[in-house]
Amino acid sequence: GTAYGILELSRMIGVSPWEWWADSPVEKKQSFKLKEGFKTLQYPSVARRGIFINDEDWGLTPWSYLTHEPSDTKGQIGPKTHARIFELLLRLRANTFWPAMHTCSVAFYLTPGNKETADKYGIFIGTAHCEPMMRNTNAEWKTAGTGKYDYVNNRENVLRFWEERVKELASSDNIYTLGIRGVHDGKMQGANTLQEQK
């Protein structure tokens, strides 16, 4: 709430939410006055408002790890980049973020500082349709999973994989994807018919 209040004043004095990302110039003013007793009370009509970073391979990923936040780790979008994204979200009155999740980028929670930056900015983190329980299976199952990513035939290991992340994020604001499908955009393994998939 405090951030939204301060950023509302920022908007009123002419600072664009895009001031950093789009190099939007800030109009200089000699003074700015609010009427005595000024009050504004605003409520969002939608509780969670945000963006999903998708198809990050051609723009955000190379810009982040090669230019804005140089890293020896190819595809890493780190906390410095996310801080800029989160500031923009707050300036746009948003509060939710679905991070990049393709093979060209390092999974959000595998980059030190990303979780803490989201917590600092009060941003809810969600995951895409193929990332149940905050796990980027595309990137993380290879290193943190055991056996095949197959809930039907490897249930205990899949549950353990999810449980580790849920415990890690217990104190953070998250939106959990509960459905299951295969790695990335593949079909769910071990279930070949609609009845088996239920």
Which role fits each region the language model picked out?
Residues 1-152, 170, 174:
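Feature activates predominantly on carbohydrate-active enzymes
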Residues 85, 114, 161, 165, ...:
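A general structural detector for well-ordered alpha-helical segments in enzyme core domains, enriched
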Residues 148-153, 189, 193:
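Polar low-complexity intrinsically disordered regions enriched in Ser/Thr and small residues
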Residues 152-163:
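Glycine-rich anion/phosphate-binding loops
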Residues 172-198:
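Active-site neighborhood of glycoside hydrolase catalytic domains
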